[in-house]
UniProtKB/Swiss-Prot annotation:
Cellular component GO terms held in the UniProt record: cytoskeleton; cytosol; mitochondrial outer membrane; mitochondrion; protein phosphatase type 2A complex
Lineage, broadest ranks: Eukaryota, Metazoa, Chordata, Craniata, Vertebrata
Protein name: Serine/threonine-protein phosphatase 2A 55 kDa regulatory subunit B beta isoform
Species assigned in the record: Homo sapiens (Human)
WD repeat segments: 22-61, 87-128, 171-209, 220-260, 279-317, 334-375, 410-442
Modified residue annotations for Phosphothreonine: 298
Residues the record lists as Phosphotyrosine modifications: 295
One GO process term, biological-process aspect: apoptotic process
Amino acid sequence: MEEDIDTRKINNSFLRDHSYATEADIISTVEFNHTGELLATGDKGGRVVIFQREQESKNQVHRRGEYNVYSTFQSHEPEFDYLKSLEIEEKINKIRWLPQQNAAYFLLSTNDKTVKLWKVSERDKRPEGYNLKDEEGRLRDPATITTLRVPVLRPMDLMVEATPRRVFANAHTYHINSISVNSDYETYMSADDLRINLWNFEITNQSFNIVDIKPANMEELTEVITAAEFHPHHCNTFVYSSSKGTIRLCDMRASALCDRHTKFFEEPEDPSNRSFFSEIISSISDVKFSHSGRYIMTRDYLTVKVWDLNMENRPIETYQVHDYLRSKLCSLYENDCIFDKFECVWNGSDSVIMTGSYNNFFRMFDRNTKRDVTLEASRENSKPRAILKPRKVCVGGKRRKDEISVDSLDFSKKILHTAWHPSENIIAVAATNNLYIFQDKVN
């Protein structure tokens, strides 16, 4: 994946697979840490699996930077809200890393209601020679203690521990859809359908409500919050998107409750494209600031749009992800696929964007050359270190040998979650219960 998306130079490795997928094994979020050395995935079973990149070896060039399992832990358990008689799923909705400050790693994970701060650390020594406890940790009889011992640290096999350091609960009435760490690294926000809360990492029993769009009469509700993110450099600025296809940029310096936006991004609808499904497919499923902070990228059902922060009336770029599905919206509505929430990501230099589609396809768009490519993440078509071939979807008429008909697309195979290494051309793609890593091929 050079800057012009040279698909001839893509190879892949296959990381996580269960031949017989259960609902709990389906990957629900993927996220690289700030250095790209670690890659975290969360699944519907409430588990977090962290992969660590291998150090490059001169005598094994083909194993350049492969990722192996580093730690696995149960982040969330299923719960029951007795006041509302509602089950709370253990599914991990989002994972966000904090920048590394010391030898340990910290990450946030959230399900529908509760955000947790996890510390992931290594141990390769253990203390021995306590005076009041024996080697098993049991208290010794003081009468048997005749000498004073100085405890010592003994080497042991490397062990990776994940411990919950903070639990942020009881602040969301509705389902959490986004968490975002602020650039001050002291605060973060969590967003649900109607509210956005601001948290301090040190305070778990109190949060500040910074956005509240809940009407006094719920019958007047016309839109919900679908995603939210802090600006990468300005700690006072954040954006949130809505189910109406609008994006609001807010400045926390203006007021404590950001009920008035600073900027409002919306593209006027083309009357010729108006249909029963217009409002559904215009709902934004993901919003991402570029690394530079100059642009916002949004994903709706059929397109990816790039907005300049200085121009609110229309996007500067619009990319068709799978426009061939426009004629299939009726059947996609009937099987609920039209409500799928696809994510989108930038590459490290903001020059290429990536998002998922159906049939285990994912799309890449080069913003400079305007070239795009469709690739497939599947076991049948991609063995480890094999070169990926571009795929094409045929709409009616004659179908070429290397094309796939739009009628034969498998809508149960979908790529909703992807991640891009912060500085290298390495991507992670979650296809149901399988995780794929794709990278530049070594020449």
